[in-house]
């Protein structure tokens, strides 16, 4: 039996329901970073500096350094060449997939079973059946880094046997900032993620090779989208110790 719990506060480790306390095991807010004093302090600073939001394109002639600073910080943290911030994890996934589909317009695409909708693109949907039955011979492969809400390992070694002419796009929303996201593969690897799950900010990110990220930052879908909220980006950038 399932329940809907209606409350006006973000849950922490425990939630109350019908007079009893239960452990909260939802698929977000993993670190409860919003309660960390350093994050709260830096978010307040960010709001004072950047007000409520900034919706202009990142390629506008008026630019702020805070976005690139966090991109460099997260690229270094996750040991990739470059990163591109987006307004959400779903947008990050869609932009990455759109970019690869334009780069290889005739390529076959295969989505693993249970892949998050962030990596869906009509008419392509996740393959039916179990992950072990998924055929991984398409040029573009999309999958989740780990199953959610039920934890399920997907990267079991097949990725090491892919070829260099394949592209593997992995949604890391439920691993990034929690466990290692290092993937050893000959394929061209692009990782996307929500930054709300562990990092606690309303944003998404694309991680990959510098050539891919540079090209994505010229793509109309990235250029035309509003950037991540700069106040939250500032908080994440200057509260990195809170995530360690």
Description of each model-found segment:
Residues 1-54:
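N-terminal "arm"/small-domain region of PLP-dependent enzymes with the aminotransferase-like
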Residues 24, 83-87, 109-112, 143, ...:
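General beta-strand structural signal in soluble alpha/beta enzymes
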Residues 32-33, 59-64, 117, 146-151, ...:
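Short, small-residue-enriched loops and turns at beta-alpha junctions
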Residues 40-88:
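Conserved N-terminal alpha-helix of the aminotransferase class I/II PLP-enzyme fold
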Residues 81, 99-120:
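Conserved PLP-anchoring active-site segment centered on the Schiff-base-forming lysine
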Residues 126-170:
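Active-site phosphate-binding strand-loop segment of PLP-dependent enzymes
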Residues 167, 174-244:
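Active-site C-terminal subdomain of aminotransferase-like
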């Amino acid at each position: 039996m399932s329940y809907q719990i209606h409350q006006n506060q973000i849950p922490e480790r425990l939630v109350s329901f019908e007079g009893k306390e239960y452990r909260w095991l939802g698929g977000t807010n993993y670190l409860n970073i919003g309660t960390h004093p350093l994050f709260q302090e830096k978010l307040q600073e960010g709001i004072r500096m950047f007000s409520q939001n900034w919706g202009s394109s990142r390629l506008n002639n008026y630019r702020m350094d805070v976005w690139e600073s966090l991109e460099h910080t997260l690229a270094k943290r996750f040991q990739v060449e470059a990163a591109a911030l987006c307004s959400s994890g779903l947008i990050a996934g869609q932009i990455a997939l759109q970019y690869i589909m334009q780069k290889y317009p005739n390529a076959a695409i295969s989505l693993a079973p249970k892949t998050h909708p962030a990596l869906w693109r009509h008419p392509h949907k996740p393959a039916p059946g179990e992950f072990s039955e998924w055929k991984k011979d398409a040029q573009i492969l999309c999958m989740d880094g780990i199953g959610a809400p039920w934890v399920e390992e997907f990267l079991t070694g097949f990725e090491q046997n892919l070829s260099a002419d394949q592209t593997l796009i992995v949604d890391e929303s439920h691993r990034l900032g929690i466990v290692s996201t290092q993937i050893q593969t000959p394929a061209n690897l692009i990782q996307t993620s929500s930054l709300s799950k562990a990092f606690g900010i309303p944003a998404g990110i694309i991680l990959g090779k510098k050539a891919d990220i540079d090209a994505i930052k010229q793509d109309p879908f990235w250029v035309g989208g509003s950037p991540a909220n700069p106040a939250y980006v500032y908080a994440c950038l200057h509260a990195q110790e809170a995530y360690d």
